[in-house]
Every structure is written in structure tokens, then in C-alpha cells.
Design a protein with these regions (language model features):
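Sec-dependent bacterial lipoprotein signal peptides
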Residues: 1-5
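Short, glycine-/small- and polar/acidic-enriched structural segments
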Residues: 18-167, 184, 190, 202-208
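Short, solvent-exposed loop/beta-turn-alpha elements that line the ligand-binding surface or hinge
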Residues: 51-60, 211-224, 290-299
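Pocket-lining segment of extracytoplasmic ligand-binding domains
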Residues: 90-92, 100, 173-269
């Protein structure tokens, strides 16, 4: 489902102001900034920004948002220049950069590790305990696949032979499969873990993939945080409207700080935008690892993560690591 929300109002012109040349006048006109967010933690971090724009409280630019169910829906919108900013899986940002010959830049890391391995029972306590099991997950070709495969390999398990990974199109399918299969486990991101537990309180979080990733990196002598999501901007838009990009980042930072610091109020907004129900959001938000990292810190964290993915499978990042121009403001 797609929800369209948010539209800032343009400031009026003062009739007493002397006539100015066209270029000067153009700088006073709000820029239309079209943003696509994925249903989940990335959209949850934006809800304060969205609600303020929706209420007409942000008149600096003309803000509009749409919430999409799948990353597959975002790619064509970016390619066709139908959106200017998008929240996408971290590796997809690099894939888009390569597919568009540098047509996108990453402006912020917005979500760290949110993946959890869940089971019905109490048999999985280490990654090694996954040997011989069927793992249900959504997100083939994105962070879930590459993070899981890396963690399995570092624990001495072959993802192709020591476990069976069944890729589903939606997280709800994974939950259903978990309930049906004896000994099965499901890898789910927040807030979907909380959604599943609300429906079945026997579902237990067995492994925090964020912690397992960090342990695997440490054992391999590598240093990279598990990064789930980032925000990207079309390069053409960033070049034409750098002030609008900076305004976007300012509002986004404030939104993330509000969401992390005001969980009950943020949960109401999340429910209002039909991302997940308010009750689920209230429980899930503290575990969603919503963050805001820009500039050199963003580059340091994201480049390390992409290098690990590239070492596993070059196609995970679109065939090659992105160039310096990929990192906005770094």
C-alpha cells in the first residue's frame, strides 16, 4: 500500500518588495522535494518530519512523501526522476549508484542493525545451532541475505549446504512459515518481530544479528557496523538544490531525535501513517536502531560495510564499490 502524505506551504510575496531579477526571485520559491520511504524503521524515523510538513509548519520547501512497501518500488522512481530523495537498503544505494552512473548520492545512514532470528521454542542460542535448520526470511539480494550469509560463514556454516534458506517476498509469510514448520526459524526485522510476537507470544528472539555481525567482524579482524538503511538523493537534484538537501537533512535529524526521545508520541504518529499499529510501534521503536549519521562518519561506517559485502559478492553492491562522489558532504 502506498500512502501520500505531507506538503509544505509556500510563503507569499510581499507586494511592497521592489521587483527583482528572475534569478533572485527564483531563490525565494520553495523547491518541491519528493521523498519515498520504506514501510518500516526508515519511515518511522521520518514521521515527525512528515507530520510537521503535513500540518503546514514547514514552509521552507515544498515537502511531499510517499510510503512504499518494497525497495523494488523505489528503484524505478529514482531512475525516472519521479522522486528526489529515497530511503533504501544500504547495499541498494551502491547498486543504484552503479546502475545510474553516479546518479545518486548517499546523504545519511538512517538505520543500523534491525534483524533478529526468531523461533518457536528454546533451541537456538548460537549461530552454530542453526546447522541443519530451515531459515525463512524476506530480503533476498539486500541486507538480510548478505548479513545472514556473512554471519553463517564466519561461524563455519556454509549457507548453501549447512542450512536451508527459504526466501519469501514478505515478512508475514516468514511468520506463517515459522508457525507451521517444526524446528524452523525466521529472520525478521523490527518492527515486524514485535508485530509477530503480538500475535503469538511463543515467538522468541533467539539471535540478535547486529551482535552476531559485530562478533563475526571482530573475529575476522574487520571493523564495520551492520547498516540496514540509508537515505539517497538524486545527484542532479543535489547539484541544483543544495540548500534543499541541507534543509531536508536538518528536518530529518530533528525528526530522528524526536522519534528516539519521545517514543509514545512517535508511536502515535507511526500508527497514524499506517506504518505499523501504535501499540506495536511503542514496543518496537526502542529496538529499531533508528539513527542519523552524515558526513565523514557516514562515509567511514558505510564504506566499511560495503567493502565487506563486496568481498563476499561484488554484485551485492552493483559490481564495484562506489566512488568518492557517492558520499554527500564527506
Amino acid at each position: 500500500a502506498i500512502g501520500l502524505v505531507g506538503c509544505g506551504s509556500a510563503a507569499g510575496n510581499d507586494a511592497a518588495t521592489p521587483a527583482r531579477d528572475a534569478d533572485a526571485a527564483a531563490t525565494t520559491e520553495p523547491v518541491a522535494v519528493r521523498t519515498a520511504a520504506l514501510k518500516g524503521p526508515t519511515a518511522m524515523g521520518l514521521v515527525r518530519f512528515m507530520s510537521e510538513a503535513d500540518a503546514g509548519n514547514l514552509a521552507d520547501e515544498d515537502w511531499s512523501f510517499q510510503i512504499l512497501a518494497s525497495a523494488d518500488e523505489v528503484t524505478p522512481l529514482i531512475a525516472k526522476s519521479e522522486v528526489d530523495v529515497a530511503t533504501v537498503p544500504a547495499n541498494l544505494a551502491s547498486v543504484l549508484y552503479n546502475k545510474t552512473d553516479g546518479g545518486v548520492r548517499v546523504v545519511a545512514v538512517n538505520t543500523l542493525g534491525v534483524l533478529y532470528v526468531c523461533e518457536l521454542g528454546d533451541e537456538v542460542n548460537t549461530v552454530s545451532d542453526l546447522r541443519g535448520r530451515t531459515i525463512y526470511s524476506a530480503g533476498k539480494g539486500a541486507t538480510p541475505q548478505y548479513a545472514l550469509e556473512y554471519v553463517l560463514r564466519q561461524a563455519g556454516l556454509d549457507p548453501d549446504s549447512d542450512v536451508t534458506i527459504e526466501w519469501k517476498s514478505e515478512h508475514a509469510e516468514c511468520v506463517a512459515a515459522l508457525a507451521e514448520g517444526a524446528g524452523a526459524v525466521a529472520m525478521l526485522p523490527q518492527p515486524f518481530v514485535t508485530t509477530a510476537q503480538a500475535k503469538n507470544d511463543q515467538i522468541r528472539v533467539a539471535l540478535d544479528l547486529n551482535r552476531e555481525w559485530e562478533s563475526a567482524c571482530e573475529a575476522a579482524g574487520q571493523k564495520a557496523r551492520l547498516i540496514t538503511g540509508v537515505a539517497v538523493v538524486r545527484s542532479e537534484f543535489a547539484d541544483a538544490h543544495p540548500e534543499a538537501v541541507d534543509a531536508f537533512l536538518d528536518h530529518y535529524r530533528e525528526s530522528v531525535e524526536y522519534v528516539n526521545g519521545n517514543v509514545p508520541e512517535a508511536a502515535k504518529l507511526v500508527g497514524g501513517y499506517d506504518i505499523v499499529p501504535e501499540t506495536v510501534a511503542a514496543k518496537a521503536l526502542p529496538a529499531c536502531n533508528i539513527t542519523f549519521v552524515v558526513g565523514q562518519d557516514m562515509r567511514d561506517q558505510l564504506s566499511g560495510y560495503l567493502e565487506i559485502l563486496f568481498g563476499q559478492n561484488a554484485q551485492a553492491v552493483g559490481g564495484s564499490l562506489p566512488g568518492d562522489d557517492f558520499y554527500y558532504g564527506a
